[in-house]
A protein has these predicted regions:
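Basic, amphipathic alpha-helical/coil surface patches used to engage anionic, phosphate-bearing ligands
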Residues: 1-293
Length: 293
Protein backbone atom coordinates (compact mmCIF):
# COMPACT_ATOMS: atom_id res chain seq x y z
CA UNK A 1 0.00 0.00 0.00
CA UNK A 2 1.26 3.45 -0.88
CA UNK A 3 2.53 5.42 2.09
CA UNK A 4 0.90 8.80 2.60
CA UNK A 5 2.74 11.61 4.38
CA UNK A 6 1.52 12.32 7.89
CA UNK A 7 -0.90 15.22 8.09
CA UNK A 8 -0.38 18.27 10.25
CA UNK A 9 -3.02 18.67 12.99
CA UNK A 10 -4.81 21.45 11.10
CA UNK A 11 -4.80 19.39 7.88
CA UNK A 12 -6.18 16.38 9.73
CA UNK A 13 -8.96 18.54 11.11
CA UNK A 14 -9.91 19.81 7.64
CA UNK A 15 -9.77 16.28 6.24
CA UNK A 16 -12.06 14.90 8.94
CA UNK A 17 -14.60 17.67 8.38
CA UNK A 18 -14.54 17.06 4.63
CA UNK A 19 -15.21 13.37 5.25
CA UNK A 20 -18.47 14.48 6.89
CA UNK A 21 -19.36 17.35 4.55
CA UNK A 22 -18.78 15.74 1.16
CA UNK A 23 -21.00 12.68 1.66
CA UNK A 24 -23.76 15.06 2.78
CA UNK A 25 -23.28 17.19 -0.35
CA UNK A 26 -23.27 14.03 -2.45
CA UNK A 27 -26.63 12.94 -1.06
CA UNK A 28 -28.24 16.36 -1.36
CA UNK A 29 -26.83 17.63 -4.68
CA UNK A 30 -26.04 14.43 -6.58
CA UNK A 31 -28.64 11.91 -5.41
CA UNK A 32 -28.97 10.26 -8.82
CA UNK A 33 -25.25 9.76 -9.43
CA UNK A 34 -24.43 6.07 -8.88
CA UNK A 35 -21.59 4.69 -6.76
CA UNK A 36 -21.46 7.41 -4.11
CA UNK A 37 -18.55 5.66 -2.40
CA UNK A 38 -16.30 6.28 -5.41
CA UNK A 39 -16.63 10.01 -4.78
CA UNK A 40 -16.75 10.07 -1.00
CA UNK A 41 -14.21 7.47 0.10
CA UNK A 42 -11.31 8.69 2.23
CA UNK A 43 -8.80 8.21 -0.58
CA UNK A 44 -10.67 10.43 -3.03
CA UNK A 45 -11.29 13.12 -0.43
CA UNK A 46 -7.66 12.99 0.66
CA UNK A 47 -6.38 13.47 -2.88
CA UNK A 48 -8.54 16.54 -3.48
CA UNK A 49 -7.61 17.98 -0.09
CA UNK A 50 -3.89 17.49 -0.70
CA UNK A 51 -4.05 18.86 -4.24
CA UNK A 52 -5.72 22.05 -3.03
CA UNK A 53 -3.69 22.55 0.14
CA UNK A 54 -6.56 21.74 2.49
CA UNK A 55 -8.42 24.94 1.65
CA UNK A 56 -11.95 23.82 2.42
CA UNK A 57 -13.91 26.01 0.02
CA UNK A 58 -11.56 25.28 -2.88
CA UNK A 59 -11.58 21.55 -2.17
CA UNK A 60 -15.38 21.43 -2.11
CA UNK A 61 -15.70 23.45 -5.33
CA UNK A 62 -13.15 21.30 -7.17
CA UNK A 63 -14.67 18.10 -5.83
CA UNK A 64 -18.18 19.11 -6.95
CA UNK A 65 -16.84 19.95 -10.43
CA UNK A 66 -15.26 16.48 -10.54
CA UNK A 67 -18.50 14.73 -9.62
CA UNK A 68 -20.36 16.71 -12.27
CA UNK A 69 -17.76 15.99 -14.95
CA UNK A 70 -17.35 12.30 -14.19
CA UNK A 71 -21.08 11.63 -14.00
CA UNK A 72 -21.56 13.41 -17.34
CA UNK A 73 -18.48 12.42 -19.37
CA UNK A 74 -18.46 8.90 -17.86
CA UNK A 75 -14.75 8.17 -18.45
CA UNK A 76 -15.09 4.77 -16.77
CA UNK A 77 -17.50 3.72 -19.53
CA UNK A 78 -15.18 4.48 -22.47
CA UNK A 79 -14.87 1.21 -24.36
CA UNK A 80 -11.84 -0.30 -26.05
CA UNK A 81 -14.16 -1.18 -28.94
CA UNK A 82 -14.83 2.46 -29.85
CA UNK A 83 -13.32 3.15 -33.25
CA UNK A 84 -11.20 6.07 -32.07
CA UNK A 85 -9.89 4.04 -29.11
CA UNK A 86 -9.06 1.03 -31.28
CA UNK A 87 -7.11 2.97 -33.89
CA UNK A 88 -5.11 4.93 -31.34
CA UNK A 89 -4.34 1.80 -29.35
CA UNK A 90 -3.05 0.12 -32.51
CA UNK A 91 -0.69 3.03 -33.16
CA UNK A 92 1.38 1.99 -30.15
CA UNK A 93 1.89 5.57 -28.96
CA UNK A 94 0.54 4.85 -25.49
CA UNK A 95 1.09 1.57 -23.74
CA UNK A 96 0.93 0.36 -20.17
CA UNK A 97 3.70 -2.02 -19.16
CA UNK A 98 4.45 -3.21 -15.64
CA UNK A 99 5.50 -0.74 -12.93
CA UNK A 100 8.30 1.01 -11.04
CA UNK A 101 9.97 -0.30 -7.86
CA UNK A 102 7.03 0.88 -5.77
CA UNK A 103 4.52 -0.96 -7.99
CA UNK A 104 3.18 2.22 -9.59
CA UNK A 105 1.92 1.28 -13.11
CA UNK A 106 3.98 2.75 -15.94
CA UNK A 107 2.55 4.35 -19.07
CA UNK A 108 4.94 4.53 -22.04
CA UNK A 109 4.21 7.55 -24.24
CA UNK A 110 6.27 7.23 -27.42
CA UNK A 111 6.15 10.14 -29.81
CA UNK A 112 7.69 8.27 -32.74
CA UNK A 113 4.40 6.38 -32.99
CA UNK A 114 2.32 9.56 -33.22
CA UNK A 115 0.40 9.52 -36.49
CA UNK A 116 -0.56 12.85 -38.01
CA UNK A 117 -4.31 13.09 -38.58
CA UNK A 118 -5.12 9.84 -36.80
CA UNK A 119 -7.30 11.60 -34.24
CA UNK A 120 -8.82 15.00 -33.56
CA UNK A 121 -7.85 16.81 -30.33
CA UNK A 122 -11.15 15.65 -28.77
CA UNK A 123 -10.46 12.04 -29.76
CA UNK A 124 -6.90 12.30 -28.46
CA UNK A 125 -8.20 13.54 -25.11
CA UNK A 126 -10.74 10.72 -24.97
CA UNK A 127 -8.02 8.14 -25.62
CA UNK A 128 -5.73 9.55 -22.92
CA UNK A 129 -8.60 9.50 -20.43
CA UNK A 130 -9.41 5.90 -21.41
CA UNK A 131 -5.79 4.88 -20.88
CA UNK A 132 -5.58 6.69 -17.55
CA UNK A 133 -8.71 4.97 -16.26
CA UNK A 134 -7.22 1.65 -17.30
CA UNK A 135 -3.96 2.35 -15.49
CA UNK A 136 -5.65 3.52 -12.30
CA UNK A 137 -7.63 0.29 -12.12
CA UNK A 138 -4.35 -1.61 -12.29
CA UNK A 139 -2.84 0.68 -9.64
CA UNK A 140 -5.71 -0.13 -7.31
CA UNK A 141 -5.07 -3.85 -7.74
CA UNK A 142 -1.43 -3.25 -6.79
CA UNK A 143 -2.34 -1.24 -3.70
CA UNK A 144 -1.28 2.04 -5.28
CA UNK A 145 -3.00 5.31 -6.11
CA UNK A 146 -0.48 6.86 -8.49
CA UNK A 147 1.11 6.15 -11.86
CA UNK A 148 4.35 7.05 -13.61
CA UNK A 149 4.85 8.04 -17.25
CA UNK A 150 7.87 7.51 -19.51
CA UNK A 151 7.63 10.13 -22.26
CA UNK A 152 9.98 9.02 -25.04
CA UNK A 153 10.74 11.54 -27.78
CA UNK A 154 13.48 9.55 -29.50
CA UNK A 155 12.89 8.96 -33.20
CA UNK A 156 10.43 11.84 -33.51
CA UNK A 157 10.73 13.40 -36.99
CA UNK A 158 8.78 15.39 -39.57
CA UNK A 159 6.30 12.56 -40.14
CA UNK A 160 5.15 13.02 -36.53
CA UNK A 161 4.89 16.82 -36.62
CA UNK A 162 1.42 17.82 -35.53
CA UNK A 163 0.53 21.43 -34.67
CA UNK A 164 -2.67 20.14 -33.04
CA UNK A 165 -0.71 18.27 -30.36
CA UNK A 166 -0.47 21.43 -28.28
CA UNK A 167 -4.22 22.00 -28.68
CA UNK A 168 -4.91 18.50 -27.41
CA UNK A 169 -2.51 19.11 -24.53
CA UNK A 170 -4.29 22.32 -23.58
CA UNK A 171 -7.60 20.44 -23.48
CA UNK A 172 -6.23 17.45 -21.61
CA UNK A 173 -4.05 19.10 -18.96
CA UNK A 174 -6.83 20.86 -17.01
CA UNK A 175 -8.85 17.64 -17.02
CA UNK A 176 -5.96 15.69 -15.55
CA UNK A 177 -5.13 18.36 -12.99
CA UNK A 178 -8.73 19.01 -11.93
CA UNK A 179 -10.27 15.55 -12.12
CA UNK A 180 -7.31 13.26 -11.43
CA UNK A 181 -5.46 15.10 -8.64
CA UNK A 182 -2.52 13.43 -6.94
CA UNK A 183 -2.48 10.60 -9.48
CA UNK A 184 0.86 11.33 -11.17
CA UNK A 185 4.00 10.41 -9.27
CA UNK A 186 6.58 11.26 -11.94
CA UNK A 187 6.74 12.12 -15.64
CA UNK A 188 10.09 10.90 -17.00
CA UNK A 189 11.28 12.51 -20.24
CA UNK A 190 13.73 10.76 -22.59
CA UNK A 191 15.17 12.53 -25.64
CA UNK A 192 14.53 16.10 -24.48
CA UNK A 193 16.25 18.01 -27.28
CA UNK A 194 15.92 21.66 -28.35
CA UNK A 195 12.47 21.14 -29.92
CA UNK A 196 11.13 19.65 -26.69
CA UNK A 197 12.50 22.60 -24.75
CA UNK A 198 10.84 25.05 -27.13
CA UNK A 199 7.48 23.29 -26.81
CA UNK A 200 7.89 23.07 -23.05
CA UNK A 201 7.97 26.87 -22.89
CA UNK A 202 4.38 26.79 -24.16
CA UNK A 203 3.27 23.78 -22.13
CA UNK A 204 4.38 25.32 -18.84
CA UNK A 205 1.97 28.24 -19.40
CA UNK A 206 -0.99 25.93 -18.74
CA UNK A 207 0.52 23.31 -16.42
CA UNK A 208 0.43 23.82 -12.64
CA UNK A 209 3.61 24.33 -10.65
CA UNK A 210 2.87 21.17 -8.72
CA UNK A 211 2.73 19.14 -11.92
CA UNK A 212 5.86 20.77 -13.36
CA UNK A 213 7.76 19.67 -10.27
CA UNK A 214 6.97 16.05 -11.16
CA UNK A 215 8.73 16.23 -14.53
CA UNK A 216 12.16 14.57 -14.58
CA UNK A 217 14.36 14.90 -17.67
CA UNK A 218 16.63 11.86 -18.01
CA UNK A 219 20.02 11.80 -19.65
CA UNK A 220 19.56 8.23 -20.88
CA UNK A 221 17.40 5.16 -20.42
CA UNK A 222 19.91 3.89 -17.85
CA UNK A 223 18.60 6.51 -15.44
CA UNK A 224 15.32 4.58 -15.29
CA UNK A 225 17.12 1.84 -13.36
CA UNK A 226 17.16 4.16 -10.35
CA UNK A 227 13.40 3.77 -10.02
CA UNK A 228 12.64 0.59 -12.00
CA UNK A 229 13.79 -3.00 -11.63
CA UNK A 230 15.48 -4.30 -14.78
CA UNK A 231 13.00 -7.14 -15.16
CA UNK A 232 10.14 -4.65 -15.23
CA UNK A 233 11.49 -2.60 -18.13
CA UNK A 234 11.22 -3.23 -21.86
CA UNK A 235 14.49 -4.00 -23.65
CA UNK A 236 14.63 -0.62 -25.39
CA UNK A 237 14.54 1.05 -21.96
CA UNK A 238 17.36 -0.98 -20.45
CA UNK A 239 15.23 -3.91 -19.37
CA UNK A 240 15.25 -7.59 -20.24
CA UNK A 241 11.87 -8.24 -21.83
CA UNK A 242 9.99 -7.41 -25.01
CA UNK A 243 6.65 -7.67 -23.22
CA UNK A 244 3.64 -9.37 -24.75
CA UNK A 245 4.29 -11.14 -28.05
CA UNK A 246 1.69 -9.29 -30.12
CA UNK A 247 3.08 -5.91 -29.22
CA UNK A 248 6.68 -7.09 -29.60
CA UNK A 249 5.99 -8.18 -33.18
CA UNK A 250 4.48 -4.80 -33.97
CA UNK A 251 7.52 -3.00 -32.56
CA UNK A 252 9.95 -5.19 -34.49
CA UNK A 253 8.21 -4.32 -37.76
CA UNK A 254 8.24 -0.60 -37.05
CA UNK A 255 10.87 1.51 -38.77
CA UNK A 256 10.94 3.69 -35.68
CA UNK A 257 11.90 1.08 -33.12
CA UNK A 258 14.85 1.35 -30.79
CA UNK A 259 17.12 3.86 -29.13
CA UNK A 260 19.45 4.08 -32.12
CA UNK A 261 16.96 6.16 -34.07
CA UNK A 262 18.42 9.47 -35.21
CA UNK A 263 17.50 12.80 -33.70
CA UNK A 264 15.61 15.66 -35.32
CA UNK A 265 18.61 17.42 -36.89
CA UNK A 266 17.64 16.45 -40.44
CA UNK A 267 14.26 18.11 -39.93
CA UNK A 268 15.55 21.11 -37.99
CA UNK A 269 14.48 23.77 -40.49
CA UNK A 270 10.94 22.43 -40.70
CA UNK A 271 10.74 21.96 -36.95
CA UNK A 272 11.85 25.54 -36.34
CA UNK A 273 9.11 26.77 -38.67
CA UNK A 274 6.59 24.56 -36.91
CA UNK A 275 7.72 25.84 -33.52
CA UNK A 276 7.46 29.47 -34.64
CA UNK A 277 3.91 28.90 -35.92
CA UNK A 278 2.86 27.19 -32.70
CA UNK A 279 4.30 30.04 -30.64
CA UNK A 280 2.46 32.57 -32.80
CA UNK A 281 -0.84 30.70 -32.57
CA UNK A 282 -0.61 30.55 -28.78
CA UNK A 283 0.54 34.13 -28.29
CA UNK A 284 3.85 33.21 -26.70
CA UNK A 285 7.12 34.93 -27.53
CA UNK A 286 9.60 32.33 -28.87
CA UNK A 287 13.05 32.20 -27.28
CA UNK A 288 16.09 33.06 -29.33
CA UNK A 289 17.76 29.81 -30.28
CA UNK A 290 21.47 29.48 -30.88
CA UNK A 291 23.22 26.76 -32.85
CA UNK A 292 23.67 23.65 -30.77
CA UNK A 293 20.77 24.39 -28.43
Amino acid sequence: MENRPALKPEQQQVFEKLCIQLPEIMRSEFPDVPDHDHYTNAGAIGRFAAAHEYKTETVIAKWKAWVQWRSTYKPHEISETEETIEKQTESGKLRWYKYDKEKRPCLYYRMRFHTLGLATPDETVRFFIYMLEKGLKEAEKLGQTKIVVVYDRRGYDKSNQDPKSIDAGKQLTPLLQDYYPERLHCFYVIGANWFYRMMFNIVKTFVSKKTLEKIAILGSTEDLLDTFNKEDLLIEYGGVTEGDQKFAEKVKKSKRNGADEGDESEDETELRKLADNIYKNHGVEPPKLTDGM
